[in-house]
């Protein structure tokens, strides 16, 4: 047997409107998706609670439901209304009581004095690897917005606004998904609740005009991707004449040789196997030229060495990072007869005979004797 709307809200059939509203608040809060994330059962119950409330809070729909049942409502456009809100007014009042003041109500609408433009904005600036590391001068072209003086930033002819017909001055509209109604900012007035009856001819209803400008900027040493540099008083111009700031967001390119990690530089450097065995002072490239690395005898493949203060200067201080050199030992891929003979003699001089070194042979003998004992 199908559960009734009264049972869903846990009320009796003779409940008055205030009782229905209180019951809805309780059940909606209990099963709201924000409090039951990922719970499909709670989501389904929340939909039923909204469905029940939309019927029982409406005298006409409730009377039809009480007399003919749920099926009688389907043909009459259940879940919708001529105003397009589908019970939105009551839903907004209810949700405001436990999700913040003014949810879905006119108290959330913006003031017509609000700016149509933000005071600050961001522009991206691409730099080469070296420009970011060592700093540079860059000329930046940008576009900024200036609040329209003709309409005082309203976008309306002579600055005159009328109540938005879409949201009736609320600044929000109800959007239904099934039996659930959500509040969203009115797309026609952007939440102000008012709009122009006739657009300003100067700004075409935007409330602002755009202008182009350029500025030369000194990029400091050590900037990196994601960092922002503030340029004072180069932002948008607001109604009261104050001007915001422009933020320049750095996008630094990578390098084919060096890898940067904050203020440290990494490089993989090839070393011939004889250099690794014998040890040697070698020259390695750095971001400033080259430096000497004293390679110890018996250096291992992948071993890392630190060249202090050969990295990037910190953008906020005078500290300089390090360069980390990771060696990659290289072996010859082809040998002539003379080289082959020399290597064979070298191999024999280390006691390698019949393809096995004396130490390896001794180890095998120890293992064999262990099994015999």
Curated annotation (Swiss-Prot):
Family: Belongs to the DnaJ family.
PANTHER family (UniProt xref): CHAPERONE PROTEIN DNAJ, DNAJ HOMOLOG 1, MITOCHONDRIAL-RELATED
Protein known as: Chaperone protein DnaJ
One of the record's GO molecular function terms: unfolded protein binding
Organism for this UniProt entry: Campylobacter jejuni (strain RM1221)
CXXCXGXG motif repeats: from-to residues: 148-155, 164-171, 186-193, 200-207
Domain J: 4-69
Superkingdom in the source lineage: Bacteria
Domain notes: The J domain is necessary and sufficient to stimulate DnaK ATPase activity. Zinc center 1 plays an important role in the autonomous, DnaK-independent chaperone activity of DnaJ. Zinc center 2 is essential for interaction with DnaK and for DnaJ activity.
CC cofactor: Zn(2+)
ZnF segments: CR-type: 135-212
Known partners and oligomeric status: Homodimer.
Broad class of where this protein is predominantly found: cytoplasm
Keyword annotations of the record: Chaperone, Cytoplasm, DNA replication, Metal-binding, Repeat, Stress response, Zinc, Zinc-finger
Cofactor binding description: Binds 2 Zn(2+) ions per monomer.
